[in-house]
Amino acid sequence: MKIAYLMRHDITKNDGVTKKVLDQTTEWKKSGHTVQVFCYVYNKGKSIIVDANQYKIRPPLKNKFVLENDLLKDLEVFSPDVVYYRYSTLNRTLRKVLSKYKVVTEVNTDDLGESKLLWEKERNLKSFARYFTYTLFRSQILKKVQGIIAVTKEIAELPSTTKYDKPTVYIPNGIDLEKYQTIKKQNEAYERVGLFFIGSPNQPWHGVDIIEEMSKKLPQYDFHIVGMEGDSSENLFWHGYLQKDEYLKILKKCQICIGTLALERKNMKEACPLKVREYLAYGYPTIIGYEDTAFLENDVDFILKLKGNKVSDEAIEKIGSFIELVKKMVVTSDLIQNIDIIELEKRRLSFIEDIFKN
C-alpha cells in the first residue's frame, strides 16, 4: 500500500509524538509499504522524520477556510491508497482530503471530554471556542472517515466514537524495545530508595500533588520530579525541565518510576502513555493511577495500579509494600512484549489493509 500520514504537530521538537510517528512509519516501511508524512508545523525545521513534507500553519481563520494547495498537490502526486490521519480539528483542506481519499483516523484523546472540562474550569472565551469547535466539527470528521483507531479501549467505546458506526479498533501506544537498553541495575548499592517522575507543568491529571503527599507520608523514600519547578524538601526534589541526558542521570539513581496518578480528573480511567513504556523499557517497576490499555487482560507484579486520586492510609500501605517488593526488581524485555511496536504495528497495518480492500 501507499500510505500518506497526515498530521498537525511540531515535529521539529522531536518529542514523544514525533518519535512515535517515526517508529510507526519505519515499521510500515519495513513491512513493504510506501509511506510519506505530510505535516502541518508552526515553523519549518529539522526533524528526526527527515523526509517529512512540512507545511506552515496559517493563522487560525486562514487555516480553517483557505485551502493548503501545496499539500493537496503533493498528496495528488503521491496518490495514496489510504490517508492515515492523526486526529485534529477540521479545516477546508481536510474536507477535501476526506472527500477524495480513504481515510483512517487515529484518535489519541477524548477531545470533547477534555475541552468540556477545560471550559467548565476556566470559563473564558478561548476555552469556550475550543469546546465549541470540537463539538461542531468532530462529527463532520468521523462521519466521513472509513475507519477509526483509538489508543485505548475506553476511547473506542465512547458514545462520541461509536455513534458513527465505523470500523473501530483500539491499539495502545508502543515503543521500539530494541532502541532501549536496561538502565536499572539489579544489585546496585544505594542508601535510599528513589522514585522518579517526569511530566509537564499545568497538567492536573499528572497528580503531582499526590506525589507531594506521598513524600510526606513516606519520608523513608526520596521522590524526584522532572519537568516542573517547586520547593524541594528533605525527600522531595524538583529538578525543572531537563534534557534527556540530564534526566537519565537522575533516573539511574532511582529504583521505581511513577506515571500519571490522577487521570480521573479528566473523567477517564484508561491510558497508555509513552513515558510509562519508556520506564518499563529501562527496567523500572512503575506506580500508576489508571488502567493501562496494554495490561487490561493481565495483572503484572511490576505495575501498581492505584485507585482514586487521594492518598489514603490504605494507599500508602500498598505503595510502601510495592516499593519494598520491587525495589531490586528489573523489568526485562520478555515481560513487556505487548508494548513492543513491532507487534502493535502489525495489528494496525492489518486494520488499514482491511479498510483499503473494502
What function would you assign to each model-found segment?
Residues 72-92, 101-104:
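Short N-terminal targeting/anchoring amphipathic segment
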Residues 14-19, 202-206, 245, 249-250, ...:
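Nucleotide-sugar-dependent
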Residues 154, 174:
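Carbohydrate-associated surface elements
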Residues 8, 12, 104-136, 162-165, ...:
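Acceptor-binding helix/loop patch of EC 2.4 sugar-transfer enzymes
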Residues 26, 68-73, 93, 105-115, ...:
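Membrane-proximal helix-turn-helix segments that form the acceptor-binding/catalytic region
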Residues 307-357:
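A charged, aromatic-enriched C-terminal amphipathic alpha-helix characteristic of glycosyltransferases
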Residues 17-27, 176-179, 191-232, 237-247:
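Conserved catalytic-core segment of nucleotide-activated headgroup transferases in glycan assembly
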Residues 1-45, 78, 212-218, 222:
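N-terminal subdomain of nucleotide-sugar transferases
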